[in-house]
Amino acid sequence: MRRTGAPTQADSRGRGRARGGWPGAEATPSLPLGGSRGRESQMKETIMNQEKLAKLQAQVRIGGKGTARRKKKVVHRTATADDKKLQFSLKKLGVNNISGIEEVNMFTNQGTVIHFNNPKVQASLAANTFTITGHAETKQLTEMLPSILNQLGADSLTSLRRLAEALPKQSVDGKAPLATGEDDDDEVPDLVENFDEASKNEAN
């Protein structure tokens, strides 16, 4: 004899039990519709993802025959960008413009001078920072003479003395020694009279 449509009652475990049914008979949980189809679509997606990954790996392959050269991206930094960063950093330090400076000379250990003509000078005494902005020229110490003499320090004066000592030696080495009896002043006439005696005679 078959019983149909028997009402179910949930037990403490949450499983449905047929009331008045056979002992041990339980209601089977219903499966979601299209479960096998969902699994198939998931498998297809993973296969497609693996294919895409393989294509990407083939494109990114480094080295080997038939691969294109990898171009290194070179970022060109302009001087204006560096200047902006520098000005921003200087603004943080609180620098002030110093006006009325016509030239700045920086003396090096090699005896050369880094010369700035009409530079922009900024200073921050609290940060002990000075900036000199402008066109710089590297010149020899001898080129800057005599206007630079009052700017020379002790080290520069010693190097100037060395240069002064070296110059006569170079001039002597550069010229051939004069032969005896040869007159070096051809254009200057010889003095015949004594001018001192002539002036004394005029005074008397």
From Swiss-Prot:
SMART domains: NAC. GO terms for cellular component: cytosol; nascent polypeptide-associated complex; nucleus. Residues 80-145 form the NAC-A/B domain. Keywords: Chaperone, Cytoplasm, Methylation, Nucleus, Phosphoprotein, Protein transport, Transcription, Transcription regulation, Transport. CDD domains: NAC_BTF3 (cd22055). Residues 1-43, 168-190 are annotated as: Disordered. Pfam families: NAC (PF01849). Belongs to the NAC-beta family. This is Transcription factor BTF3. It comes from Mus musculus (Mouse).
